[in-house]
């Protein structure tokens, strides 16, 4: 594989080309990209964990240092004003010296309020960042603060990963897979959710503030809460299932993986997990360029109908009728997946072009996060689920179609919560790369 340095050189060239294009289109002279500022807790002297502007970390892996500024014009070498505070209370991140630093001019400064005097004139420059107030203090007018046409263009093209970005995402997969394996062992040894999470973080080398989203570590019926993050400190008396949805970051790029396990390998739930895994892999085998992601979401509902019929959860209707009448929806209430990259739910999932044209999902699939036609270099998650959630099932009990639900069978599955299996894939011209399965995470 090429060195990260050479991949990064080409990555910067791509970002520079995109910058030239949008500056010319909007008649701008440059982009001023702000890393962001710490946010203090209300009536407190502590800050929330700092999360960098994704538009900033697209250019280089500076993810922990607030108050930094980047100036790009698509022609000259990108210029980074790097916040190097003088502080004895907190650790000061040293001036970077890494594979990416030869491609950037770095200017250290110690006082965030100095920046106005350090920056070039800003009369025809767009500010991209989370602090419009700071931009106003720099004399920038409202129309130049996060202008939508600039954001639309940059967001749209972020879907197409450079080779550098793909290399970073493959590295993120490796650490996430290490964490998932450690978490599975912790589950099998009888640990509680809290301790399973610690095992995961330790294996990944991440703190809980480093992971790209709050880990979902769910035993038993907790798996029926889609974004369950409580982390119980007591192991249930009868452990039946384990769902883990957890990721990592590498150079600012995310991995997002999910697996579900049964405590008893000979249970019906274990068989349902195995069948779901087969359907997920079969769906991935059908993915190709030029097809809208919506089509695969609809295909998965057909596969869910097949499972519901196979396991006697629904009966008396064809699989097509189950989908048409919405009977699969309470079992799979979320979308098939989403774009992945600098953010877990990466931007522009609905954008059809780089001018902001949006295509919303069908009204019955409001939680689908991607309606784009799949093209090479896109990275997406494929994460079908099958859950037993009473609040979603309850309306069907008195419904005309309620007789098609095997309610006693559903009650027997409720203590397991549900299933989700998630891989991260890359679209290539002639094949689909499953980054997760390539590392043998089963």
From Swiss-Prot:
Entries under SUPFAM superfamilies matching the protein: Creatinase/aminopeptidase
Binding site for Mn(2+) 1: 256, 338, 383, 422
Annotated catalysed reactions: Xaa-L-Pro dipeptide + H2O = an L-alpha-amino acid + L-proline
GO MF annotation list: aminopeptidase activity; metal ion binding; metalloexopeptidase activity; phosphoric triester hydrolase activity; proline dipeptidase activity
Enzyme Commission no: 3.4.13.9
Superkingdom: Bacteria
Keywords: Dipeptidase, Hydrolase, Manganese, Metal-binding, Metalloprotease, Protease
GO terms for cellular component: cytosol
Cofactor dependence: Mn(2+)
Family: Belongs to the peptidase M24B family. Bacterial-type prolidase subfamily.
PANTHER family in UniProt: XAA-PRO AMINOPEPTIDASE 3, XAA-PRO DIPEPTIDASE
The protein, known as: Xaa-Pro dipeptidase
């Amino acid at each position: 594989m090429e060195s990260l340095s050479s991949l990064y050189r080409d990555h910067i060239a791509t970002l520079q080309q995109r910058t030239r294009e949008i500056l010319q289109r909007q008649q701008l002279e440059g982009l001023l990209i702000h890393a962001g500022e710490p946010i203090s807790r209300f009536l407190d002297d502590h800050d929330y964990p700092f999360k960098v502007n994704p538009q900033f970390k697209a250019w280089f892996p500076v993810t922990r240092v607030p108050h930094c500024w980047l100036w790009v014009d698509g022609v000259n070498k990108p210029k980074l004003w790097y916040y190097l505070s003088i502080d004895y209370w907190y650790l000061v991140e040293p001036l970077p010296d890494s594979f990416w630093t030869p491609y950037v001019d770095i200017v250290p400064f110690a006082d965030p309020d100095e920046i106005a005097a350090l920056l070039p004139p800003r009369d025809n420059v767009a500010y991209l960042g989370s602090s419009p107030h700071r931009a106003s203090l720099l004399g920038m007018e409202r129309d130049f603060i996060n202008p939508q046409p600039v954001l639309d263009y940059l967001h749209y093209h972020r879907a197409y990963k450079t080779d550098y970005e793909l290399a970073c995402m493959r590295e993120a997969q490796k650490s996430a897979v290490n964490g998932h394996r450690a978490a599975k062992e912790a589950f099998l040894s009888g640990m509680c959710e809290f301790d399973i999470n610690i095992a995961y973080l330790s294996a990944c080398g991440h703190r809980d503030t480093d992971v790209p989203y709050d880990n979902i570590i769910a035993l038993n019926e907790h798996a029926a809460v889609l974004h369950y993050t409580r982390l119980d400190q007591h192991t249930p008396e009868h452990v039946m299932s384990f769902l883990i949805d957890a990721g990592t970051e590498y150079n600012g790029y995310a991995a997002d993986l999910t697996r579900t396990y049964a405590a008893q390998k000979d249970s019906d739930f274990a068989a349902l997990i195995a069948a779901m895994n087969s359907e997920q892999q079969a769906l991935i085998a059908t993915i190709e360029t030029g097809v809208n992601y919506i089509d695969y979401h609809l295909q998965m509902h057909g596969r869910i109908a097949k499972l519901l019929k196979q396991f006697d959860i629904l009966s008396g209707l064809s699989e097509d009728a189950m989908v048409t009448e919405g009977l699969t929806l309470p079992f799979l209430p979320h979308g098939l997946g989403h774009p992945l990259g600098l953010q877990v739910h990466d931007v522009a999932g609905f954008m059809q072009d780089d001018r902001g044209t949006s295509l919303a999902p069908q009204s019955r699939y409001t939680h689908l996060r991607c309606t784009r036609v799949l093209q090479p270099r896109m990275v997406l998650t494929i994460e079908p689920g099958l859950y037993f959630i009473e609040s979603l099932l309850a309306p069907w009990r008195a419904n005309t179609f309620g007789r098609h639900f095997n309610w006693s069978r559903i009650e027997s599955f409720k203590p397991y919560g549900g299933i989700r299996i998630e891989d991260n894939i890359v679209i290539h011209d002639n094949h689909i790369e499953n980054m997760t399965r390539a590392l043998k995470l089963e």
